From Swiss-Prot:
Gene: prp43
Name of the protein this chain belongs to: Probable pre-mRNA-splicing factor ATP-dependent RNA helicase prp43
Organism: Schizosaccharomyces pombe (strain 972 / ATCC 24843)
Subcellular location: Nucleus
Function: Pre-mRNA processing factor involved in disassembly of spliceosomes after the release of mature mRNA.
Chain intervals for the UniProt region annotation (Disordered): 1-34
Domain Helicase C-terminal: 275-455
One Pfam family per UniProt: Helicase_C
Sequence motif DEAH box, residues: 197-200
GO MF term set: ATP binding; ATP hydrolysis activity; helicase activity; RNA binding; RNA helicase activity
């Protein structure tokens, strides 16, 4: 940094903190290169970008930087930089619409950097993303574009991973992480500009952030807010944000031919694989993007396509084909492989790459070279039914808006083709116009806890863009009251305050905070980490029997939670190499991730003064204590064996469920606690552990009040017996 810049940084008042110290925020901030804060011109910014030294750290630019700069200046958004700066200078809030591929996610934050001069005012620019993958991937790209180290001037912050530091000026972060930051700093005072990207996705966290930004705009007139969307339906955003001005930038799009199937496909996965191989053999050059619904489906498709493509290459029937998966829990280094060059053409045919992705590739990431899109028309969506208190990820038809976004991926570099694996009639008549906002289809317990921590007590009149159903809100308040996170007046309790500090669902947080009462907080910490990462068990189609046999080595007869602990203890006892995991059909990646999550949660426990203790392993109550701790957080997720002995019935909600096929219980206990309710062809409960019914009335007497079970005589009768037994035990203890 130049001496003049250092001096300015030390001497200038921070205009962003004027609302805290009543300082004069009219002081002009000027860089040593003549750029004036919030008055920078395109010519000045372009000159600063051209060096010879980096504007933000004064280091010489690399040769690669100038090549990337040329590419950046060809992006559609760059052509409207001047128009953007004019609107940005004149308004506090802007709604910005840029189609995917326009460059908005990478360029707009950089335009803002050269105008805000955060390195002179000790502030930062935040750019939120709905997905972890996008936050990491875009931060890496922008760090390369700015010729800085990732984690220095440009960083990212996602749940359980903070890659930023004291020098960070631009931070890409998940919307959930900015929301967590607002819980400790209601004014978000470190930021001079907050950019909410991919707002059209309407995630729960983005919707709450929009409400907060609206409140903050009046309290912090110095704060600039940009709401960015990839869809042209921006009027709703404009109206919500005080009729904010709109700037729209077209993407670089070529015409895309849409093909539909003649008849509905019975197996969309098989149809997708068939279509990919057909494109590879018969169509002209260009890469392929396939949309599937989740990790298991994607990995399975990658294996099958690779095997088939290798056969085609050996037979000389097609050119080389590289297949890459893309989904949220994929490690960053593997995510980046989607940007690797396409294989070279051969005499047998064109070289291609195939990216098989979840809906993250709809708008969050742009992959150059895609000419063909295969769209089966499905995605996994969170669905919540407040009446039966069940939240589940369901494979559901996408919306028309999503279908259009997917098709648009094919026309980025040349005319493309989109193969929709459904009929045109289904597109017109069966697909809804827009995906429902997440706030209308989610359990709101975590959100209510966050809003309470943010100091928002009137949840009903909070300015939601789309207000949630009153029943959903009441269910959330009721659940938090039963967990003792909210008192009867709806105010945060000491336990609720602690729970809000953990980046966990309330029931997991409560279980962790209460675990010292059962002398097993070390074990519950490990278990919480394991429940916060993808499945540690690997069960490939080609070796299911062997994988199941290996799992038996770790299986605990009393339940899946204890089985998970056995896996973790074996992993940590020095066994946990990548080879050991491979041989035991365990995900090395998930176990490493669980280890990192555990470290982060442990730090939070230390800050919140939650004691770390264990029952000695040889104590007969070692596993009993862990099971009791499970009940302390998950007493609302309990099921009792039904009268016929074949199924289970959930408490209060009377849902008939079966144990998931992955369940490792050696017998079917009378009472179980479960982590997940899974809806597929029928209702399953997953991650199940046996419990004793007397623990329910001991640890959650308010929830297990007999008067609340009038609609389920079978369960009420069983609970009455438990109460009678408890009363007899108490009476005998007094003698």
């Amino acid at each position: 940094m130049e001496p003049a810049q250092k001096k300015l940084r030390q001497e200038s008042k921070n205009p962003y903190l004027a609302h805290l110290n009543n300082g004069d925020d009219s002081e002009e901030v000027v860089s040593s290169k003549g750029l004036t804060r919030r008055a920078t011109t395109v010519a000045q910014a372009a000159k600063a970008e051209e060096g010879p030294n980096n504007f933000f750290n004064d280091k010489p630019f690399s040769q690669n930087y100038f090549k990337i700069l040329e590419t950046r200046r060809e992006l559609p958004v760059y052509q409207q930089r001047e128009e953007f700066l004019k609107i940005y200078h004149e308004n506090q809030i802007i709604v910005f619409v840029g189609e995917t591929g326009s460059g908005k996610t990478t360029q707009i934050p950089q335009f803002v950097l050269y105008d805000e001069l955060p390195h002179l005012t000790n502030t930062q620019i935040a750019c939120t993303q709905p997905r972890r993958v996008a936050a990491m991937s875009v931060a890496k790209r922008v760090a390369d574009e700015m010729d800085v180290d990732l984690g220095e001037e440009v960083g990212y912050n996602i749940r359980f991973e903070d890659c930023s530091g004291p020098n960070t000026l631009l931070k890409y972060m998940t919307d959930g992480m900015l929301l967590r930051e607002a819980m400790t700093d209601h004014m978000l005072s470190r930021y001079s500009c907050i950019i909410l990207d991919e707002a059209h996705e309407r995630t729960l966290a983005t919707d709450i952030l929009m409400g907060l930004m609206k409140r903050l705009a009046t309290r912090r007139p110095d704060l600039k807010i940009i709401v960015m969307s990839a869809t042209l339906d921006a009027k709703k955003f404009q109206k919500y944000f005080f009729d904010a001005p709109l700037l729209a930038v077209p993407g670089r799009t070529y015409p895309v031919e849409i093909y539909y199937t003649q008849e509905p496909e019975r197996d969309y996965l098989e149809a997708a694989l068939r279509t990919v191989l057909q494109i590879h053999v018969e169509e002209g050059p260009g890469d392929i993007l396939v949309f599937l619904t989740g990790e298991e489906e994607i990995e399975d498709a990658c294996r099958k396509i690779t095997l088939e493509a290798d056969d085609l290459v050996r037979e000389g029937a097609a050119g080389p084909l590289k297949v890459y998966p893309l989904y949220g829990s994929l490690p960053p280094n593997q995510q980046q492989r989607i940007f690797e060059p396409t294989p070279e053409d051969t005499k047998s045919g064109y070289g291609r790459k195939v990216v098989i992705s979840t809906n993250i590739a709809e708008t969050s990431l742009t992959i150059d070279g895609i000419v063909y899109v295969v769209d089966p028309g499905f995605s996994k969506q969170k669905i919540y039914n407040p009446r039966i208190r069940v939240e589940s990820l369901l494979v559901s038809p996408i919306s028309k808006a999503s279908a259009q976004q997917r098709a648009g991926r094919a026309g980025r570099t040349r005319p493309g083709k989109c193969f929709r694996l459904y009929t045109e009639e289904a597109f017109r008549k069966e697909l809804i116009e827009q995906t429902y906002p997440e706030i209308l289809r989610s359990n709101l317990s975590s959100t209510v806890l966050e809003l309470k921590k943010l100091g928002i007590d009137d949840l009903v009149h909070f300015d939601y863009m789309d207000p949630p159903a009153p029943e959903t809100m009441m269910r959330a308040l009721e659940e938090l009251n039963y967990l003792n996170c909210l008192d009867d007046n709806g105010d945060l309790t000491p336990l609720g305050r602690k729970a809000s500090e953990f980046p966990l669902d309330p029931n997991l947080a409560v279980m962790l905070i209460r675990s010292p009462e059962f002398y097993c907080s070390n074990e519950v910490l490990s278990l919480t980490a394991l429940l916060s990462v993808p499945n540690v068990f690997v069960r490939p189609n080609s070796a299911r029997k062997l994988a199941d046999e290996m799992r038996q080595q770790f299986t605990h007869p009393d339940g899946d939670h204890l089985t998970l602990l056995n896996v973790y203890h074996a992993y940590k006892s020095g066994e946990g190499t990548a080879d050991w995991c491979w041989n035991h059909f365990l995900s090395h990646r998930a176990l490493i991730s669980a280890d990192n999550v555990r470290k982060q949660l442990r730090r939070t426990m230390e800050r919140q003064e939650v004691e770390l203790i264990s029952t000695p392993f040889d104590d007969k109550n070692y596993y009993v204590n862990i099971r009791r701790a499970l009940v302390s957080g998950f007493f609302m997720q309990v099921a009792k064996k039904s009268a016929n002995g074949k199924n289970y019935v959930t408490m209060k909600d009377n849902q008939v469920v079966s144990l998931h096929p992955s369940c490792g219980l050696s017998v079917t206990p009378e009472w179980v606690v479960y982590n997940e309710f899974v809806l597929t062809t029928k209702s399953f409960i997953r991650n199940v552990t046996a419990i004793r019914p007397e623990w329910l009335i001991e640890l959650a007497p308010n929830y297990y009040d007999l008067d609340d079970f009038d609609n389920n005589k079978e369960v009420k009768s069983a609970l009455q017996k438990v109460y009678q037994m408890a009363a007899r035990s108490k009476k005998n203890a007094r003698r």
